[in-house]
Amino acid sequence: RGLGDVYKRQALYWQLNDNWPVASWASIDYFGRWKALHYMAARFFAPKAGYIYTEGTKAVISAANETLENQSLNVTVRIRDVELNVLFEETVETTVKAQSSIHVLERDFADVIGSKKRRVFAEAVYTWQDGTTSTEAESFVPYKHMDLLQPQIETSVTEKDGTIEIQISADCFAPFVWLEIEEDVIFSDNCFDLTSEETKTIYIQKEDVLSGKVLSADNVRKTLKIRSLRDTYEQ
């Protein structure tokens, strides 16, 4: 994913799956269940993807296009505080050539961040020409040093044509949100960041039920557990 010669942009992914039921660094366990790593790998290995790198008060917003065609791209960059207030916003329109990556925006946000480095994060919303969208977020300090708030997460579970839809939203910045239910399933997304008050929709398809009961909205509603990074903090 580097900016250099195309032949130097390979990545080694270790390791995909397990062939015995033990605790390991595989991203898919022995039973076919996706761990947090695999959900994240699905995003960072996407054919069209965005990235944020921060150092000090500086941020570099990048985009990679591994398809065989040039792709036009719209990126909205925001600096938000943990209460989701927008402190800075700028939209950039650009084109990412086939099989290449670019820096969309590089900026020192010291004037925006001030003394709030532990309470702010960078957000980039990517919209590609085919309508594909993704959102990236990155803090300016290690997450363990962030003054995260305890999010109040609201959910709504419905069923349509055999597909379970989970609507989820939070009232503050919620990094690394993790969904879990009683049955073994593969969610359409998991281990994601909630960076705004907009609702995110997660799907469970019939073919993604690995074991357990026949899924229904009622089953999911009763057993759904949601955690975020803040829940790992000592009280």
Model-derived features with residue positions:
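Short, small-residue-biased leader/transition segments that mark boundaries at the very start
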Residues: 2-7
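Substrate-binding cleft/loops of secretory-pathway carbohydrate-active enzymes
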Residues: 14-34
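Flexible loop/turn segments at secondary-structure boundaries
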Residues: 18-24, 59, 70, 82-86, ...
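Low-complexity, acidic Ser/Thr/Pro/Gly-rich terminal tails and inter-domain linkers that flank the onset
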Residues: 35-64, 82, 140-161
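Asparagine-centered strand-capping/turn motif at beta-strand->loop junctions
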Residues: 62-67, 167-172
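Short, hydrophobic/aromatic beta-strand segments
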Residues: 71-76, 174-181
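Intrinsically disordered, low-complexity Pro/Gly/Ser/Thr-rich segments with frequent PxxP/GP/PP motifs
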Residues: 78-116, 184-212
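Terminal connector regions
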Residues: 102-103, 108-151, 207-235
